[in-house]
Amino acid sequence: MRFALTVTGPAYGTQQASSAWQFAQAVLQEGHELACVFFYREGVLNANQLTAPASDEFDLVRGWQSLHDEHGVALHICVAAALRRGVTDEREAQQLALPGHNLQPGFTLSGLGALAEAALTCDRMVQF
């Protein structure tokens, strides 16, 4: 079965993102395909490379990155939601004359078209 996830909660402060990450791990362990994760609203904060959790906490931002690196899962960040919340890549930062960028490697700024495509091409879409 082919899955896609939508994450609307931040990396820290709610259970949404950590529950989504655990669900993603279970999907892959059961032999299913995880096509993509689309981060929307506060969920875009999962892509902020400046996040620095305490040493005894799981680093969820790098956890998502490892999901991409090890399993090829596409990590889409809603570009409009990201820019509103101060998450940007180098290209957008230059275009908007921002002083820096902070998008974690492995994540991609995307439009809602990526979410629509996932809804059309996956068997299940699960929102957290």
From Swiss-Prot:
Keyword Chloroplast listed: no
An annotated GO cellular component: sulfurtransferase complex
Cross-referenced InterPro entries: DsrEFH-like, Sulphur_relay_DsrE/F-like, Sulphur_relay_TusD/DsrE
Annotated SUPFAM superfamilies: DsrEFH-like
Keywords, ordered alphabetically: Cytoplasm, Transferase, tRNA processing
Reported function: Part of a sulfur-relay system required for 2-thiolation of 5-methylaminomethyl-2-thiouridine (mnm(5)s(2)U) at tRNA wobble positions. Accepts sulfur from TusA and transfers it in turn to TusE.
Name of the protein in its database record: Sulfurtransferase TusD
Organism, as annotated: Klebsiella pneumoniae subsp. pneumoniae (strain ATCC 700721 / MGH 78578)
